[in-house]
């Protein structure tokens, strides 16, 4: 979890992981962290759509870390996705310090 190569923004952005919609906890040009009931194993390949700056951006990535939740007490798990493919415009926007103010 500490091998990040880019700054993260504490933003709740709508993304999909496959067909499942989730919200990010934080996001940056290198990837994002999300909270969900069922986490995927580290190393799993994922793809989906980011909704940023009023546009959809497709991505591909890999699960970098996970922390399983506990369904018995309705505690969600968390996982981090490292981008392996991201459109250049989306990466540029996510690197921008102004991203925190963009809807």
Region roles according to the model:
Residues 1-29, 95-103:
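N-terminal helix initiation/capping motif
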Residues 13, 32, 76-79:
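Short aromatic-glycine-enriched beta-strand elements
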Residues 38-45, 92-93:
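Surface-exposed connector loops and short turns at secondary-structure junctions
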Residues 22, 58-69:
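Short beta-strand-centered aromatic/proline hotspots
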